[in-house]
């Protein structure tokens, strides 16, 4: 979602 490969959302 946010473009960060973290717990918030996948990269993209």
Curated annotation (Swiss-Prot):
The keyword Secreted applies. Its main location: secreted. Type I collagen is a member of group I collagen (fibrillar forming collagen). It is found in: Secreted, Extracellular space, Extracellular matrix. The lineage of its organism: Eukaryota, Metazoa, Chordata, Craniata, Vertebrata. Keywords: Extracellular matrix, Secreted. This is Collagen alpha-2(I) chain homolog. Belongs to the fibrillar collagen family. Trimers of one alpha 2(I) and two alpha 1(I) chains. It comes from the Eukaryota. GO terms for cellular component: extracellular region.
